[in-house]
Amino acid sequence: MESLSELQNPLLPRSPTHLHRPYPYPEAPPGWSCQEQLYSFLLGGAGPARAHQLLDPGSLQLAVEAWYRPSCLLGRDKVKEPKAGSCETSFTEAREPLAGPAEEGSEPGQAAEDVTIHTVSYGVQEELQGQEDSQEEESDGTSSESECEDAFLTLPPRDHLGLTLFSMLCCFWPLGIAAFYFSQGTSKAISKGDFRLASTTSRRALFLATLSIAVGAGLYVAVVVALAAYMSQNGHG
């Protein structure tokens, strides 16, 4: 150790010109005898070089340089670090933007598809419900009509015997006699089981009896008016 700086920093390299070299290991000066001693020590030589070997930072650097090139040793780490950093940044940058647009692009499509599915299913349900309701209404209408027809057919037609007798005796008797005839025909058709003929004769008997009553009532009114007019004329005379 020759100066105070070397005593304070014994492990620093001697030459400060290593900053502008391709690698930070300084070369030993040409007049330095430690290189020859290091080679003899590494090659297994004996003698004073091996016995009086001193600890020097330059010797450690030369020992590494003797077997490996410094650029290979340091270049590997220097190449790894930026590559690792670039891989991490490129991986994260490539992953995040790809995930974002994919999600943004897929979400509207999925929402629109869901809305379309719900709308179609809702329309189909409405159509099915409308068809079911219309079928139920039609079935109810047909069932009610059939029930009415069945009830009408099961009920035997009436002969209107009392009405025909009243029209024959108390009203216009020719129409009353015809109504009584159809009333008897209705009773015979019912006894035979011919409900179609019975309903026809029953309607005719009802019509003739009603007409006979109307005509008879008109005749009675006309007779009363004529009698009143005749009596009024006789009273004045």
Swiss-Prot record:
Superkingdom per UniProt: Eukaryota
Cytoplasmic topological domain residue ranges: 183-204
Family per similarity comment: Belongs to the CD225/Dispanin family.
CC terms in the record's Gene Ontology section: Golgi apparatus; membrane
Protein name as annotated: Synapse differentiation-inducing gene protein 1-like
Tissue localization of expression: Expression is restricted to the caudate-putamen. Down-regulated in R6/2 transgenic mice, a model for Huntington disease.
Extracellular domain ranges by topology: 1-161, 226-237
Chief localization: membrane
Organism annotation: Mus musculus
